Amino acid sequence: NDPAQWKIAKQFELRQVKKSYLAIVHGTPELQADRINMPLGIHPKIREKYAIRPEVGKEAVTFYEVLETFRGFSLVQCKPQTGRTHQIRVHLSHLKHPIVADDMYGGKLVYPWQLADAEPAVEEPVISRCALHAWTLEFTHPTTAQRVSFEAPLPADMQHLLDLLRRYR
């Protein structure tokens, strides 16, 4: 109902909602965990894209932690403290570890033959979309005032990519 929706929206506005995402990125960040505090704004030349904009951007903060490493890739948990458009994608790309298949921010498609260290083959990519997943959400229930949390399982395509990365470590 409207009052409940308003209370939840207010929590987002006040940054009281805790969100975490899982991303599969190229390479492994230098630090196991860190805070990225880089302001974001619309890209100066490409209107559909966002970029680090120190002088004119809005505050954007993301905490990340490397959960698992593989040959050439990592599974990273990201906890945005602000809610800017494309925030996680831009921040990870800025670290030089773009999200797999995120072509807008430097991520490449990954093919099974690459992971298996085999000869190039004509195959479909393991995942054809940005390997980013909204994993958990926590907020105060609008009527009971109890903290509630929700977890969404990995989509099949991301799980398949993780399975292959684990197999071909």
Protein language model annotation of sequence segments:
Residues 1-169:
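RNA pseudouridine synthases
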